[in-house]
Amino acid sequence: MTNIRKQHPLAKMINHSFIDLPAPSNISSWWNFGSLLGLCLMIQIITGLFLAMHYTSDTSTAFSSVTHICRDVNYGWTIRYLHANGASMFFICLFMHIGRGLYYGSFTFLETWNIGVILLFTVMATAFMGYVLPWGQMSFWGATVITNLLSAIPYMGTGLVEWIWGGFSVDKATLTRFFAFHFILPFIIAALAMIHLLFLHETGSNNPSGISSDSDKIPFHPYYTIKDLLGVIFLLLCLFSLVLFSPDLLGDPDNFTPANPLNTPPHIKPEWYFLFAYAILRSIPNKLGGVLALVFSILILTLIPFLHTAKQRSMMFRPLSQCLYWMLVADLLTLTWIGGQPVENPFIAIGQTASIIYFLIILILMPLTNLLENKLLKW
């Protein structure tokens, strides 16, 4: 009798995606981050659901409802900090996942890559709206500053900002709609992730060498289920260490103060995972120019497949490209550091230099280096 997993329509679908899926035999631990992102999303949805049971999206009670969750709800503090630090873990995995895609040339799967970029934008929007919900000082002022950026759009900007706010400032209407969107978006992210996987399984996974692995495939289960399980253990270890030992390490002290529209914090900054984009935004003195640079700093990922001029797919055997890649990583870390610093010299100059280097590496140096390597390898 044929196994039920190969007969039942639903089980058959799961079987083809996670059990009998032919996978390259040489994929490294860098390929673990896809499953870890799925785990992070599940953690966020489950903890978020429990938080939503106790949270109130009203300006007068939002801050105290979060305090109530931490003090009075059974293990409320654990759920709250799992959710807050789970977002940080989500972004760490996301950046690693994108970094792996860039290094090993996974961006040549155009549909998978572009859905991934849409996913990145959606996750960033969700995280931003989630940061507003505790209604602390940084929540309020972060929401005010970031939504105000849309006023840079010519002609319709001001009207658009007031439409998003639901009034003439960030207030009850803004908080209520942000809560509604923050609740629904993770389910949209889950649907997009399924489309992402659907496109990936059309082509099959890439591998570190960047060459076709059709002649050497192994079943996903048990080899990669065990390998993914190791990644899951490491991720949970890091997450629980953060939650149980220093839950506020990645937060902002200003968010322990209830939102006050009459008192501006000395230094407004978003969560750490947005700091690189925030630094690029601040490095341009013009408001519209800054907003365009901010959007393009993420949107540039969609151009990477078209800027890929190398004959080899992966960077595994291309040392010059590897040097540029690690320079880009160092540049992004510099931008993250600068985004958290006050707007004064020398930070302004460093931020502007790092922003120029970021676009320079991706748009000019990478394609030229690829062409040079083709010449050196006589391709």
UniProtKB/Swiss-Prot annotation:
It comes from the Eukaryota. SUPFAM superfamilies: a domain/subunit of cytochrome bc1 complex (Ubiquinol-cytochrome c reductase), Transmembrane di-heme cytochromes. It is a multi-pass membrane protein. Signal peptide: none annotated. The keyword Mitochondrion applies. CDD domains: cytochrome_b_C (cd00290), Cytochrome_b_N (cd00284). Heme b b566 binds at residues 97, 196. Binds 2 heme b groups non-covalently. The chain crosses the membrane at residues 33-53, 77-98, 113-133, 178-198, 226-246, 288-308, 320-340, 347-367. GO terms for cellular component: mitochondrial inner membrane; respiratory chain complex III. Belongs to the cytochrome b family. Component of the ubiquinol-cytochrome c reductase complex (complex III or cytochrome b-c1 complex) that is part of the mitochondrial respiratory chain. The b-c1 complex mediates electron transfer from ubiquinol to cytochrome c. Contributes to the generation of a proton gradient across the mitochondrial membrane that is then used for ATP synthesis. The cytochrome bc1 complex contains 11 subunits: 3 respiratory subunits (MT-CYB, CYC1 and UQCRFS1), 2 core proteins (UQCRC1 and UQCRC2) and 6 low-molecular weight proteins (UQCRH/QCR6, UQCRB/QCR7, UQCRQ/QCR8, UQCR10/QCR9, UQCR11/QCR10 and a cleavage product of UQCRFS1). This cytochrome bc1 complex then forms a dimer. This is Cytochrome b. The gene is MT-CYB.
